[in-house]
A protein has these predicted regions:
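Metallocofactor- and cofactor-centric catalytic cores in central/energy metabolism, strongly enriched
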Residues: 2-83
Length: 83
């Protein structure tokens, strides 16, 4: 049975980049799974695989909601996740 593919979306804080001083970071795909995404993968179990983590700063998303939403959803859809 194939694993269920998961994309994890997190903010700059949970990506380990910083707090409010880094909240203006534009959306990007993490090159390696941040620790919190690895923890999610472990918690989900063997039937799931976290295939991508998308990161975006809270302030950036809030101030650019329409364009940020399109960027983030595009990054998620590229990975063709099941969940």
């Amino acid at each position: 049975m194939d694993k269920i593919k998961v994309v994890h979306y997190i903010n700059q804080f949970f990506a380990g980049i910083g707090g409010e001083e880094k909240a203006d970071i534009k959306p990007f795909i993490a090159e390696e799974l941040p620790p919190i995404s690895s923890q999610l993968a472990k918690a989900l179990g063997e039937d799931f695989e976290v295939v991508r983590t998308v990161v975006c700063g809270d302030s950036y998303f809030g101030e650019n909601m329409e364009s940020a939403q399109k960027e983030v959803l595009g990054m998620i859809k590229e990975a063709n996740p099941d969940f």
